């Protein structure tokens, strides 16, 4: 089965090489002849010339607008924030805490940090066993 596939593949490749060498396979001459006859059939009319000039004018205008937009749009300068080691881009400053939102200062002195208690209220580490 493998020998039959190998033989058929070699046969197909040999046919492609022979046709390629004779110039009959993948001929470029036909495409160039069709293009040449289409361009010689009739000269462009005034309407086609007008639309071509309008299109070129629009393209030039768009190109000018794009270049103006690229000139106007510049990256914003970087600012350094106190408390941070490296300067941040102004566009990414939204991730930093806003100064308008101030959080309440939590008074930690009211909380008692001691030995953990269980639900009943006794110390988990009791001195008596049992």
Curated annotation (Swiss-Prot):
GO CC terms: extracellular space
Compartment(s) of residence: Secreted
Residues modified as Arginine amide: 129
Leader sequence residues: 1-25
Gene Ontology biological process terms in this record: cell differentiation; cell surface receptor signaling pathway; endochondral bone growth; hormone-mediated signaling pathway; negative regulation of D-glucose import; negative regulation of dendrite extension; negative regulation of osteoblast differentiation; ossification
Location, primary (coarse class): secreted
Induction: Is regulated by nutritional changes. Is up-regulated dose-dependently by insulin. Is down-regulated dose-dependently by forskolin. Induced in muscle following physical exercise.
Domain of life: Eukaryota
Tissue distribution of the protein: Expressed in skeletal muscle and to a much lesser extent in bone, brown adipose tissue, spleen and testis. Not expressed in neurons.
GO MF annotations, alphabetized: hormone activity; signaling receptor binding
Keywords in alphabetical order: Amidation, Cleavage on pair of basic residues, Developmental protein, Differentiation, Hormone, Osteogenesis, Secreted, Signal
Disruption phenotype: Mice grow normally and do not display any visible phenotype but show reduced physical endurance. Mice do not show skeletal deformities, differences in bone density, growth abnormalities, blood pressure nor body composition changes.
Similarity-based family: Belongs to the Osteocrin family.
Function: Hormone that acts as a ligand for natriuretic peptide receptor NPR3/NPR-C and promotes bone growth and physical endurance in muscle. Acts as a regulator of osteoblast differentiation and bone growth by binding to natriuretic peptide receptor NPR3/NPR-C, thereby preventing binding between NPR3/NPR-C and natriuretic peptides, leading to increase cGMP production. Required to enhance physical endurance: induced following physical exercise in muscle and promotes cGMP production, probably by interacting with NPR3/NPR-C.
Protein name: Osteocrin
Lineage: Eukaryota, Metazoa, Chordata, Craniata, Vertebrata
